[in-house]
A protein has these predicted regions:
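WD40-repeat beta-propeller superdomains and closely related acidic/aromatic-rich repeat-like regions
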Residues: 2-382
């Protein structure tokens, strides 16, 4: 059970703080009109609203996730609280403490009132929370060490979890028992492709990405992408140690391997070739990679694809900008790409997520920030 209602009321860690002049309303103005293609607005995102911790103690946000409709955002934090935001209203609407078990990798299921998350203490189980009742519907127990990644199928109630116990478990939300299990070397990141038929698993110690047919996960992977040579070329000092994110683009053509220092890899999702290496950041995100035992705050990677699959947005490390890369600029295999834009921000971007439906994104470090295309910025470019 989440903590008591009394604790719930005392644990309201964030309040909305406008940045500069009052921002335009987040909602309906953020609806993507036919003329608002990602290419038209990507350079013009600016912070529109900031949710700052109201308590004296400041905690790091460790994960962000949008629901399928793009109408809600869930954040998990070091303060062991699940925070839910209404995107259309531009406000925080619910705070659910999970003091007993902790919380990380909070993910909406396909039911917007249900959230799946990993535990950070007591045990290493996964928990399915009913937001309306503020009670747990189900526990999923099989892992013997910390969970490092949760990935939900885009087409069903199945999901996969990765753990430091060197296992990947396959689940159905309707059953507390794992449907299957893989034993691999450091399989700390995983992702479904958009068709929900392929799962990619990143094995950091072997510098490889394994592709499985989800329906035949117990068979050998049908493809293995070996990145050892590419790591030696682009990231020699952090080989096998700094992968933080694995994500397919929505068109299924590209696979992002986010790292926490030198840059990010964009692979051809079919061939495994490195189409581009994304540079331009200054330092690390300040979060622990899944393979790390540094004691840094947890995270989920600081880069992601835009909804059209053409761009990658990511944190700038110590320089406090959000960087934008256009992967269509990769004219040859292995292109080294610099950002096409640096979106100004006053704080660090340790986590970033694109809204799946609206022209809007969210970032976080110690505060959650909503970003919207700024009309004044667009007008100045005309």
């Amino acid at each position: 059970m989440p903590d008591s209602q009394q604790d719930h009321q005392s644990e309201t860690p964030q309040v909305g703080t406008p940045l500069g002049p009052p921002p335009p309303p987040v909602p309906r103005s953020a609806t993507p009109l036919p003329t608002q293609k990602v290419t038209d607005v990507i350079r013009h995102y600016r912070p529109a609203k900031l949710f700052r911790p109201s308590k004296r103690d400041v905690y790091h946000v460790t994960s962000l996730d949008f629901d399928d409709r793009g109408e809600f955002l869930v954040a998990a934090g070091e303060d062991e609280t699940i925070q839910v935001f209404d995107i259309l209203e531009g406000k925080s609407t619910k705070s659910v403490p999970s003091k007993k078990y902790g919380v990380h990798l909070a993910r909406f299921t396909h039911h917007s009132r249900q959230i799946l998350h990993a535990s950070t203490k007591v045990d290493d189980s996964l928990r399915l929370l009913d937001l309306h009742k503020e009670s747990y519907l189900r526990y999923f127990t099989t892992h013997k060490d910390k969970v490092t990644c949760l990935a939900l199928s885009p087409g069903s109630d199945t999901f996969i979890s990765c753990s430091k116990d060197d296992t990947v478990a396959l689940w159905d939300l309707n059953s507390r028992n794992a449907q299957g299990k893989l034993k691999l070397a450091t399989p700390y990141l995983a992702a479904f492709d958009p068709s929900a038929t392929v799962i990619a698993i990143a094995s950091q110690s072997t510098s490889s990405i394994l592709l499985y047919d989800y329906r035949n996960y117990d068979k050998v992977p049908f493809a293995t992408f070996d990145l050892a040579t590419q790591e030696e070329r682009y990231t020699p000092s952090t080989r096998g140690r700094m992968w933080t994110r694995l994500e397919f683009s929505n068109d299924g053509k590209s696979l992002l391997v986010g790292t926490d220092y030198h840059g990010h890899f964009v692979l051809d999702a079919f061939e495994g070739t490195v189409n581009a290496f994304l540079t331009g950041r200054n330092g690390a995100s300040g979060r622990a990679a899944p393979v790390s035992s540094s004691g840094k705050p947890l995270g989920q990677g600081d880069a992601c694809f835009t909804t059209d699959g053409r761009f990658v947005v990511g944190g700038g490390g110590d320089q406090h900008n959000v960087l934008v890369w256009d992967i269509q600029q990769a004219t040859e295999i292995g292109s080294v790409l610099k950002p096409i834009a640096k979106l100004p921000h006053r704080g660090r971007t340790a986590i970033i997520e694109m809204n799946p439906r609206y022209n809007m994104m969210a970032s976080a470090d110690k505060e959650v920030v909503f970003w919207l295309p700024d009309e004044h910025s667009r007008a100045s470019d005309r």
